[in-house]
Regions:
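Structural alpha/beta core scaffold segments of enzyme domains
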Residues: 1-256
Length: 256
């Protein structure tokens, strides 16, 4: 669950498996197995007993999210993205009124290439080889995880197997690689998520619901249109400074 964390793990058996170098805690919400090969690491991780704290969002499910969206559509107040003329009167005076509700679900970016990065950390410098859509954002994330100033960190942008925004807005995978490398100074660490990890721990396209009410004249021409949107903001998480008067222009422009 989002907001969950790591309680504990028992690596007494796993660290003795072939190829395993270390079993490490990574931040507050992940465990990594460092091994000679990726398959050895995955096999060991699958066998590792882990206790998770599922956090405050454990009760959140599809039904509760749907209820929040409906509540937003029915709320008395809302931020106004665009208003031209008196739409309420235009619809009230229409010969015919058409209403429709549309829904866009959460969707995983599902890039062809799962999240990955390679990192090498020393007390003097941190280097990261990272498939990224935003080198500046990647550098900021790497510097934060490395505990070093940005001018002592290098991010090498490499070819990526699909991005779709997932590798531009968030660099949690690069941060994880650095946090692992920081516990093994001087050792290059290649982090590669499994497809299952990539699907479960993605940052999804926001869920949105829109209610549209249109007024038509006797000839079927549109005389008024009112659109109400309820959903998760894109910019509030990615770049809140771009929000204007409570309006997420990415969501608003996508609707238009």
């Amino acid at each position: 669950t989002f907001g969950g964390g790591l309680k504990s793990f028992d690596d007494s058996r796993v660290r003795k498996l072939p190829g395993v170098r270390k079993v490490l805690r990574v931040g507050e919400d992940a465990v990594a197995v460092v091994a000679e090969t990726w398959w050895q690491a995955k096999t060991a991780l699958d066998a590792l007993p882990i206790v998770w704290d599922r956090g405050d969002n454990v009760q959140v499910d599809s039904a509760s999210i749907e209820a929040m969206l409906d509540e937003g559509l029915s709320a008395k107040e809302a931020f106004v993205g665009n208003q031209v003329g008196d739409v309420k009167r235009a619809i009230a005076d229409a010969d015919r009124i058409v209403e429709a509700t549309y829904r866009y679900p959460f969707q995983n970016h599902a890039t062809m290439e799962p999240m990955n990065a390679t990192a090498r950390w020393t007390e003097e410098r941190c280097e990261v080889w990272c498939p990224t859509q935003n080198g500046e954002a990647a550098l900021q994330a790497v510097a934060k995880a490395a505990g070093l100033p940005a001018n002592r960190c290098e991010v090498y942008k490499i070819h990526l197997g699909g991005g779709f925004g997932r590798r531009g807005a968030f660099h949690d995978f690069a941060e994880q690689a650095v946090r692992i490398a920081k516990q093994m100074p001087g050792t290059p660490i290649k982090l590669l998520w499994t497809r299952e990890e990539d699907m479960l721990h993605g940052h999804y396209h926001p869920i949105t619901k829109a209610r549209m009410v249109g007024g038509l004249d006797a000839a079927g021409r549109l005389t008024g249109l009112h659109i109400r949107i309820s959903g998760q903001s894109i910019l509030a998480a990615v770049n809140p400074a771009w929000m204007r008067n409570g309006v997420d222009m990415f969501t608003f422009q996508g609707l238009l």
